[in-house]
Amino acid sequence: MNFKTLTMQWTGNSLILVDQRKLPHVVNYVECKSYAEVARAIKDMVVRGAPAIGATAAFGYVLGAKEAATLKNQNFIDVMKNVYDVLASTRPTAVNLFWALNRMEKCVDLSKAVDEILEDLEKEAIKIAEEDIRINKTIGTHGQTLLKDGCAVLTHCNAGALATVDYGTALGVIRAAVESGKKIKVYVDETRPYLQGARLTAWELLEIGVETILITDNMAGWVMKQGKIDAVIVGADRIAANGDVANKIGTYSVAVLSNQHGIPFYVAAPTSTIDIKIKNGSEIPIEERSHDEVTHVHGVKVAPDGVAVYNPAFDVTEHQLITAIITEKGILRPPYKENIAKLFGG
């Protein structure tokens, strides 16, 4: 069984990922032949974006199961628990990682032969990947109704095809609007320190012919004040039960600025990103990454020796700042706690 998109390719025995650290000027691929290599690729941000991480982890789980099946002197379930733990430890904030791993774990039927288990797991991983594409396109269909023809949108980080299995969430909304015949202009925050906006989002948008204007993160407020922005759309790595949203660091600042200037602030994400076990944003674990990401830019040191660094990869935007959350099941509006509960049958 094979599967291929821009972000990833499953060969049946390995997972090939486009190396997002090298884009846009170099297109390299990293082939992962074991679950440990998949875990390293997630941790090192070869692949990033909550939905993409989830699907990648699912294929990593398959590779782990294939490896476990060859270990004659070890209990299959014990090995798979370790596979789960290794993959789950890679990126603590993105809930899609745990959602996908839990789904894969539930797929293991010990009443079946190992070969059947492996086949079931491979089918489930491909199903997760294929579902993500359909979900993203549905998010786009719902979300594009919020964008008027000729409007200008600001986005932060990268929530496009590269952050998902394909099509994208926030960029999927923009893409769907363009496909419906609307003319959309997009302002892209560069998104320090990893520059996902400059390197990935700008590249994706230009590839599909969208008018794209790159700005530094500290320009967003001034651009809003000048009346250049009609809406803001971002993705999400985890959404709490009350509607608080964890997303790439800098999202909170953009939300505050949007609120100050009366600009609608939209979040686009699949329902798998909603963690109903988390009451509010204060309970969401925030990953901290290497100091080198702040002190260096593309390997060039820009900060003095000995300077202290704080590098949280995500921040939390309170639900009061969010105009709507766009999901595959429709557009959620306040009160989020009640409407999210209804979405999950509460």
UniProtKB/Swiss-Prot annotation:
Belongs to the eIF-2B alpha/beta/delta subunits family. MtnA subfamily. Catalyzes the interconversion of methylthioribose-1-phosphate (MTR-1-P) into methylthioribulose-1-phosphate (MTRu-1-P). It is an enzyme of class 5 (isomerase). HAMAP family: Salvage_MtnA. The record marks 157 as: Transition state stabilizer. Pfam families: IF-2B. This is Methylthioribose-1-phosphate isomerase 1. One of its GO terms (molecular function) is S-methyl-5-thioribose-1-phosphate isomerase activity. One of its GO terms (biological process) is L-methionine salvage from methylthioadenosine. The keyword Cytoplasm does not apply. It catalyses: 5-(methylsulfanyl)-alpha-D-ribose 1-phosphate = 5-(methylsulfanyl)-D-ribulose 1-phosphate. Pathway: Amino-acid biosynthesis; L-methionine biosynthesis via salvage pathway; L-methionine from S-methyl-5-thio-alpha-D-ribose 1-phosphate: step 1/6. Its EC number is 5.3.1.23. It comes from Pseudothermotoga lettingae (strain ATCC BAA-301 / DSM 14385 / NBRC 107922 / TMO). InterPro entries: IF-2B-related, IF-M1Pi, IF_2B-like_C, Initiation_fac_2B_a/b/d, M1Pi_N, NagB/RpiA_transferase-like. The active site is at residue 237. Keywords: Amino-acid biosynthesis, Isomerase, Methionine biosynthesis. Substrate binds at residues 48-50, 91, 196, 247-248. It comes from the Bacteria.
